[in-house]
Amino acid sequence: MRPPVPSAPLALWVLGCFSLLLWLWALCTACHRKRAQRQQTGLQDSLVPVEMPLLRQTHLCSLSKSDTRLHELHRGPRSSIAPRPASMDLLHPRWLEMSRGSTRSQVPNSAFPPRQLPRAPPAAPATAPSTSSEATYSNVGLAAIPRASLAASPVVWAGTQLTISCARLGPGAEYACIQKHKGTEQGCQELQQKAKVIPATQMDVLYSRVCKPKRRDPRPVTDQLNLQDGRTSLPLGSDVEYEAINLRGQDMKQGPLENVYESIKEMGL
């Protein structure tokens, strides 16, 4: 028979295996973290060498370190804002500028007067008409006339306002004025006065083509027909009168005479 195996070494073996697995897990985790850190540092190292040459390029840098320091030491007056490096002063020394300024001050002002740019004349107001030689149709007195009043009474504006503007303007602006003769103005005024004096009933009679007949004495009503003269007399009403009109001339006696009756209404009777 075999001797019994103690249980203590079996428990130690299980505990040793568990600790070994735990140590392996910690080791793998540490390696993974370290690898991730190395990758990040590698990316940073690869980006820095790319950015540094870009920053060191001369066309991207306005001032180098030496120029910036010299510019701070030899800074000009505070009014000058131009960020010019101090090394450029070697090309344009200050003593040369000072000598030029002194020579310019010594030159007499009468020999070389300062040049001035031509200035435009002040703009005239829109309401005032222009009387200069360069006056055009757009700025000669016509803009002051309102359109509504011109449409309401064109004769009055043409006779008064435009003639006044022509009188104010000089002889050089006659081409932009409207001149009216006195005869036409008088004729228009007479027509307006007559139109005001004549009543409406007389105006209707004036413009009608049928002349108003004279009032005749009442005659007896007859129904006789006179064939020799070629005229007929019919009974007359109170408001309507029939009158025979001979269309043919008196010297023409050929053929029967035609009688045409025209009704004429008396107005105002």
Swiss-Prot record:
The modification Phosphoserine is found at residue 263. Palmitoylation of Cys-28 and Cys-31 is required for raft targeting. Phosphorylated on tyrosines upon TCR activation and/or CD4 coreceptor stimulation, or upon BCR stimulation; which leads to the recruitment of SH2-containing proteins. Residues 1-7 are extracellular. It is a single-pass type III membrane protein. Residues 261-264 are annotated as: Interaction with LCK, PLCG2 and PIK3R1. Residues 242-245 are annotated as: Interaction with LCK and PIK3R1. This is Lck-interacting transmembrane adapter 1. It comes from Mus musculus.
